[in-house]
Every structure is written in C-alpha cells, then in structure tokens.
C-alpha cells in the first residue's frame, strides 16, 4: 500500500534555527549548512552571529556615508534636488539642515558633516564586526550571559524584543527633539512657500493621532498617509516613541502569557519570519507615503507627487490663458464641462480637464487660493503670487511618472523634463523590497511552522547540489 504521508512527520525534527543542537565550527559537516548559506552557519554561535550583524550594520552605515558624500560632491545648488537624482540629501533637507525659505539650499556643510560622521561610525562598526567574527568568543552565553541567548528561551527573546522597542522609541524621540529644540524641521506649509521652523504646538490629542488609523485608505481619506500637518507628524512620534518605550519596558519585565506561548513558534527561523513580515509592512507603507504625501516628503526636495504635477499643469494654463483674456470661470471645454474650472462630486470648485480625477489634492502652493467651497474664483483672479506660478510651472514639467527609458512627465505635457524623480525611485524600490521581504516572510514562516510540527520543508539535505561539487579548499 502506498504511504500517503511522510514518515518523517512522526520524528522530531530540529532545523538548525532551533538552537538546541550543540554545534561548533562553521562548515557543512558541523552546521549542516554550506558556505553559501551565509549566516545560517552561525545560528548557534551567538558571538559569531553578533559579528555578522555588527559588520552588516557597518556596511549599511558605510553606504549611507559614502553615498551622502557622493551626492554632496555632485550637488548643484542652482538646480532642484529632485532633478539631480539625489535620494539622501532630500532627507537631510527635510530635517531642516542646510536649507532656508522655499527649500533653497544655503549651506552644504551639514551634509558633508553627516557623510563624514557616517563613515567614521562605519569604521567603528566594521572593526567591531571583524573582531567578533574572527577574534571574539564563538558563543556569548558563558562569558557574557546578558548578551547570550537560546532561541527557545521565550523570556530572553521577549527581553530582546523589549530592548529593540526602547531603541525604536528613542529614535522617534530624536526626531521630536530636533523639531522642538534643535533648529526645527522643514515645513512645506509655512507661509510664502515653505521654511524651516520649530514645532511649538504639538498635536497630542489621541482622537486626532489615532483617528488617522481609523481612516479609510482610499480616495480623499488616505489613512495615515493623508497627514498634512507637521504638528500631527511630530505629535504622532511622541505617541509612537512613548508606546515603544513603555512596550519595551513591559516586555523586559514580563514573561509571555500562556496564549502567546501557544500562539507563536519560538525558534530562530520563526523570529526571522516575523522580522521579515514587519519589514515588508514598513516597506509598503513607506511606498505609499513617499508617493502620495508632500508634507513628510516635501515636493521642494523630492519633486511633486503625480496628482500635484497634474494639478500644476492645469493651474499653469489657467494662469496663462487668464492673462490672455480667457474667462476661466465660464469657459467650456470640448466635452461640455468646464475647461479650467468645474465642480467635484461634492460640489467643490475644482480644476477642469483630465486633472479632475485628482480634485482632492492638497498642496501648499494651491491651498491659499481655496475658499470654503473649493477654489475661489476671486482669489484666482486677484491673489495668485509669483512664487505659486513658478512652483507650479516647475512641478508641471517634473511629474514623477517615468517609463523604463526614463522618459517622464504628464502624458499631455510637451515640456516634461526627461528624468527619474526620487519620489518614483523611492516608492518603487520600497514596493519591490517590501514584496520580496513578504515572500521571504512566507518562506521562513512555512519552514518554521513545519519544523515545529515535526518535519522540515525545503531541499532535502542529502540531495543538496553543493554536496556533489568540488570543495573550495
């Protein structure tokens, strides 16, 4: 009779993520993992795994510092940041360093300092990584029990979780301190076209902060991505920082409840899967944030959003034709709808033409021209400022829309600049990374659950191709 199930199911299987096998060395024979499996060889060597993590941090910080200095070296102050392929300097500018009114860069020295500090930090991390990978103790449990761990020790794992949460909370409060006391941050909504300012009136109301979480993610609602107020952003970081720190203290002081012990798989591979899942969510949220939000990601540095570029085109031609004598309030377009202005489904006065689909856009160069019922016709005739005209003309030709050969711009805009917007680049890269992190989460979660159930998913170790290959040494 043919067996319909794997006999392996009935034997306890210890994958090498479980941390119960007494292993030494870093080769195939002693770990079960070949050299190309990377850090999997170090699962039960806490000292060496620490070295790998510290060295990895060093590589990350080295890239940040080197790329930072590369962007500073190539930066042209006369051109907008978003036209120069910059992805790091916009973040520094958003934090208020080196910029003045209108987002104009007035000093590149803070950017240079940032790059140098990251390079110095990467050297320290690099030396630490090399030390722990090559010279330090293989395991930490004996000599440094505070830093040692066993993957199945639930209490130790939640203590480590708590420490991480506290560090995240401190990071959130660093932004709060920068905004409140150390020079402020760049506010794209500051009167006259944006400026650096200190945040003096934080939004701490839980109904406002947590109200964002209850919003619909669609249309004009936009969930947390719809935030358009720096007071709300910094106040949200106060809440997040407090929750992370209090949650961290909670996890350090307590042991997992019975339901948590039953619900979760407690192994190294399970923790890896949880981490990848969390990073995936972060990536998808960051993708939406950088694509749609022009407050946390000011258009002066990242370029306009797609809807913003489209609305800017309509506004630019309204300004032009109004000067040529057109009555923008009553002119009819080819479809019978208003050529320049029309009404939204809720009765607001909005721009006409194809940009009507973006009628709920909010942008600092446009909001001064709105009244209680949408765009105010009298303001459009009398109150348009030169900086609004200049900015909309610039945004009209720099839409974050591009094909594979980098030909970008609104489809109907013949003057579009051929470039890749950092907004496009950051949104796309975070979506792609978020997707692959999610796939990694599913893969490792499946393996971890299978191991907990008593069998191992993946390539049969007896049939691994590497076993038939010639050894490297």
UniProtKB/Swiss-Prot annotation:
Q: Where are the transmembrane segments?
A: 69-93, 134-155, 178-200, 255-275, 291-312, 447-471
A molecular function (GO) held by this record is: chlorophyll binding
Q: Which residues bind [CaMn4O5] cluster?
A: 367
**A GO cellular-component term linked to this record:** photosystem II
Reply yes or no: does the keyword Transferase apply: no
InterPro entries, per the entry: PS_antenna-like, PS_II_antenna-like_sf, PSII_PsbC, PSII_PsbC_sf
Q: Which domain of life is it from?
A: Eukaryota
Which key words are in the record?
Acetylation, Chlorophyll, Chloroplast, Chromophore, Manganese, Membrane, Metal-binding, Phosphoprotein, Photosynthesis, Photosystem II, Plastid, Thylakoid, Transmembrane, Transmembrane helix
* Membrane topology per record: Multi-pass membrane protein
UniProt modified residues of type N-acetylthreonine: 15
Q: Name one GO biological process term.
A: photosynthetic electron transport in photosystem II
**Major place of localization?**
plastid
Per the annotation, how and in what number is the cofactor bound?
Binds multiple chlorophylls and provides some of the ligands for the Ca-4Mn-5O cluster of the oxygen-evolving complex. It may also provide a ligand for a Cl- that is required for oxygen evolution. PSII binds additional chlorophylls, carotenoids and specific lipids.
Provide the protein's localization. Answer: Plastid, Chloroplast thylakoid membrane
Q: Which residues form the propeptide?
A: 1-14
- Keyword Glycoprotein assigned to the entry: answer is no
Query: Phosphothreonine is carried by which residues?
Result: 15
Q: State its role.
A: One of the components of the core complex of photosystem II (PSII). It binds chlorophyll and helps catalyze the primary light-induced photochemical processes of PSII. PSII is a light-driven water:plastoquinone oxidoreductase, using light energy to abstract electrons from H(2)O, generating O(2) and a proton gradient subsequently used for ATP formation.
NCBIfam families under this entry? psbC (TIGR01153)
Its family remark reads: Belongs to the PsbB/PsbC family. PsbC subfamily.
Q: HAMAP family, per this entry? A: PSII_PsbC_CP43
Subunit and partners: PSII is composed of 1 copy each of membrane proteins PsbA, PsbB, PsbC, PsbD, PsbE, PsbF, PsbH, PsbI, PsbJ, PsbK, PsbL, PsbM, PsbT, PsbX, PsbY, PsbZ, Psb30/Ycf12, at least 3 peripheral proteins of the oxygen-evolving complex and a large number of cofactors. It forms dimeric complexes.
State what protein this is by name: Photosystem II CP43 reaction center protein
In its UniProt entry, the species of origin is given as Phalaenopsis aphrodite subsp. formosana (Moth orchid)
């Amino acid at each position: 009779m043919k067996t319909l199930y794997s006999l392996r199911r009935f034997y306890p299987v210890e994958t090498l993520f479980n941390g119960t096998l007494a292993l030494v060395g870093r080769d195939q024979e002693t770990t079960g993992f070949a050299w190309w499996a990377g850090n999997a060889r170090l699962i039960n060597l806490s000292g060496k795994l620490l070295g790998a993590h510290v060295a990895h941090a060093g590589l990350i910080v080295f890239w940040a510092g080197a790329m930072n200095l590369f962007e500073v070296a190539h930066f042209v102050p006369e051109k907008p940041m978003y036209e120069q392929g910059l992805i790091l300097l916009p973040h520094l500018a958003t934090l208020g360093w080196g910029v003045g009114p209108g987002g104009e860069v007035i000093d590149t020295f803070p950017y240079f300092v940032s790059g140098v500090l990251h390079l110095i930090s990467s050297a320290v991390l690099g030396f630490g990584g090399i030390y722990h990978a090559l010279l330090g103790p293989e395991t930490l449990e004996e000599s440094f029990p505070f830093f040692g761990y066993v993957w199945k020790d639930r209490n130790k794992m939640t203590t480590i979780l708590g420490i991480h949460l506290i560090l995240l909370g401190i990071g959130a409060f660093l932004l709060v301190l920068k905004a409140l006391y150390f020079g402020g941050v760049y506010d794209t909504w500051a009167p006259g076209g944006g400026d650096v300012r200190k945040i003096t009136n934080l939004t701490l109301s839980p109904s406002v902060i947590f109200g964002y979480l209850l919003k619909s993610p669609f249309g004009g609602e936009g969930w947390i991505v719809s935030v358009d107020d720096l007071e709300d952003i910094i106040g949200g970081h106060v809440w997040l920082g407090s929750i992370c720190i209090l949650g961290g203290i909670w996890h350090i002081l307590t042991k997992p409840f019975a339901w948590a012990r039953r619900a979760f798989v407690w192994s190294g591979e399970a923790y890896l899967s949880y981490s990848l899942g969390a990073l995936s969510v972060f990536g998808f949220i960051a993708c939406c944030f950088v694509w749609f939000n022009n407050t946390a990601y000011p258009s002066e540095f990242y370029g306009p959003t797609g809807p913003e570029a489209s609305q800017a085109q309509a506004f630019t031609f309204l300004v032009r034709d109004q000067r040529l004598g057109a009555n923008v309030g009553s002119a009819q377009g080819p479809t019978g709808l208003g050529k320049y202005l029309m009404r939204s489904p809720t009765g607001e006065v909005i721009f006409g033409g194809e940009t009507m689909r973006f009628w709920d856009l909010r942008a600092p160069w446009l909001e001064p021209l709105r009244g209680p019922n949408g765009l105010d016709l009298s303001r459009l005739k009398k109150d348009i400022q030169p900086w609004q005209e200049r900015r909309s003309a610039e945004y009209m030709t720099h839409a974050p829309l591009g094909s594979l050969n980098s030909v970008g711009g609104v489809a109907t805009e013949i003057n579009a600049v051929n470039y890749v917007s950092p907004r496009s680049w950051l949104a796309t890269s975070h979506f792609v990374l978020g997707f692959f992190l999610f796939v990694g989460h599913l893969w490792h979660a499946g393996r971890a659950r299978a191991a907990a159930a008593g069998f191992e998913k993946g390539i049969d170790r007896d049939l691994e191709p590497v076993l038939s290959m010639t050894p490297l040494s």
